Amino acid sequence: MDIGKSFSYVFQDRDWLKKVLIGSLILAVSLPFTAVLVGFLGLAIVSGYALEVLRNVRQGNTHPLPEWRDKWSEWMILGLKLWLALLVWSLPALLLSVFNGLGNQMMWTDSDLLGLFGGLMVAVVACLSLLWWIIVALVTPAISIRLAETGDVGSAFKVDSIYVWTKRNIGEVIIAVLVSVAAMIIAVTIGTFAGILLCLIGWVITIPAATFIANLISVHLYAQIGLRAGA
């Protein structure tokens, strides 16, 4: 896996600044409106754009960043499919949060026995939730590759094939996930400091830009696994 290429390919595009700026502006405008759901449409467009980048990398395009035109509705639908797939895969962890809340309430009762049971429940739920979130992170490359290639949300729920593919490529999948997390942390840290240097106002652009670039790094890593192993 060429990790360096995943970090550098964005900046090798002749129009990288324009493309990154547009993606960053979409994120900057969308994030404040996620509470009223409208913002999710912009986030979906960015996610769909990233999946197109993944597809282009797998097809061997030298400059895989597409132009921001003509395909916005297509990207939005593709991005919504990705979000739906990840939401469904995340449901077990989200449902466990109900028991976490119940355990917390039991801990604050006057009964020592209930408090002990509540504490044990919170600990067990925390471990199970962490385990499931790790599973979701590990299957995300396979889900992303399938959606990018087929556009069929049903392909994200073929549990057997996703499990087999992930297990067969588990070494590279773990590397890709860890590098993706590191890229997000590094990018957001740089974006935060850049925003401070720009008198905080710069955060409006620098943090969305950092998030956008980190996302592009992730899909390039996923595409590399797909190229080696097949979808």
Tell me what each language-model feature is.
Residues 32-59, 115-156, 188-231:
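Selective recognition of hydrophobic, aromatic-rich stretches within alpha-helical transmembrane segments
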Residues 18-28, 39-62, 73-74, 78-134:
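Short, small/hydrophobic-residue-rich motifs at membrane-helix boundaries and re-entrant hairpins
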